[in-house]
């Protein structure tokens, strides 16, 4: 099960009826000059959901790969994100991203980080609601929003976020936050779904990989998928891209899902949204 030529990727229906492929491809830290080639490889492997951000500085490469692919636009799901330093000018920032991507519309637009010290994410959200109303975005959401950020945003929002993209992997699951989002009707999307590779060496994961003839990454991604979580693993290697996509064919038992869940250790791999500023992003 290490590779797959044709894998049916499940979808998640967002709270506005839009369907998002549950297993996507992320381009965080992919160099701009390599992005087109890498995204072309991902599209050829079978990915139809691509996740980028203005802060990654590789939207143009994503757009070039889309244009070169010949894949009908309606078959693709493209996510990008609002830069932290542009929360006060979200409308123009979105137009810049859309043009860099070479697209008439974007499927999902996220506030990348709350940056509460700026006090601007509610203003940004109101601007995004207008873009959504004008049909330039099919769904709007947030990223890295903790419970208190949601508590600030939701009373001022006319539109409920469709997605909250947060760090989740076996050793850092944010179970309470994920449950809160799901209870509100906000889909949960995991970045760093493999714990930046650190979770793949766990004995439980390696044992299940041997049992299923799968890669450790496929086991961890299957664990995410079993819980309805959207995932966006990244790789710069075409073979690994195909392997990761094959996770959709791995079905774990409830007991095996629980075994992986027991790996929780509170080991955050990325920045803490409560204090992260990243104003330069």
Where are these regions (language model features)?
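Acidic (Asp/Glu)-rich catalytic clusters
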Residues: 14-15, 41-43, 63-73, 95-104, ...
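Acidic-and-aromatic substrate-binding clefts and catalytic sites of carbohydrate-active enzymes
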Residues: 30-33, 53-61, 83-90, 116-119, ...
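Short, acidic/polar
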Residues: 30-43, 86-101, 148-151, 172-173
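Residues at the N-termini of beta-strands
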Residues: 49, 105-108, 139, 163
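Glycine/small-residue-rich loop that forms an oxyanion/phosphate-binding "nest" at active or ligand-binding sites
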Residues: 81-83, 87-126
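Beta/alpha (TIM)-barrel catalytic core signal, keyed to glycine-rich beta->alpha loops juxtaposed to Asp/Glu
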Residues: 114-281
């Amino acid at each position: 099960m290490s590779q797959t030529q044709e894998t049916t990727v499940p979808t998640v229906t967002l709270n506005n009826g839009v369907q998002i492929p549950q297993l996507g491809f992320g381009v965080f830290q992919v160099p701009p000059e390599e992005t087109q080639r890498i995204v072309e490889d991902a599209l050829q492997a079978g990915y139809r959901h691509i996740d980028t951000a203005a802060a990654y500085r590789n939207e143009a490469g994503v757009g070039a790969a889309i244009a070169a692919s010949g894949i009908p636009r309606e078959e693709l799901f493209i996510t990008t994100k609002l830069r932290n330093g542009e929360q006060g000018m979200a409308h123009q920032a979105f137009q810049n991203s859309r043009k860099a991507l070479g697209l008439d519309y974007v499927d999902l637009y996220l506030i990348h980080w709350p940056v509460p010290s700026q006090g601007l994410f509610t203003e940004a959200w109101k601007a995004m609601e207008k873009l959504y109303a004008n049909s330039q975005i099919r769904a709007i959401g947030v990223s890295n929003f903790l419970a208190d950020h949601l508590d600030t945003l939701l009373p001022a929002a006319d539109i409920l976020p469709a997605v909250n993209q947060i760090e989740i992997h076996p050793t850092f699951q944010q179970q309470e936050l994920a449950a809160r989002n799901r209870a509100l009707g906000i889909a949960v999307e995991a970045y760093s779904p493999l714990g930046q590779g650190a979770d793949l060496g766990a004995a439980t994961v390696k044992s299940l990989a041997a049992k299923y003839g799968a890669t450790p990454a496929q086991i961890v991604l299957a664990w995410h998928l079993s819980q309805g979580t959207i995932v966006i693993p990244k790789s710069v290697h075409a073979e690994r891209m195909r392997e990761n996509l094959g996770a959709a064919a791995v079905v774990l038992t409830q007991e095996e899902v629980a075994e992986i869940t027991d790996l929780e250790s509170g080991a955050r791999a990325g920045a803490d949204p409560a204090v992260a500023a990243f104003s330069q992003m």
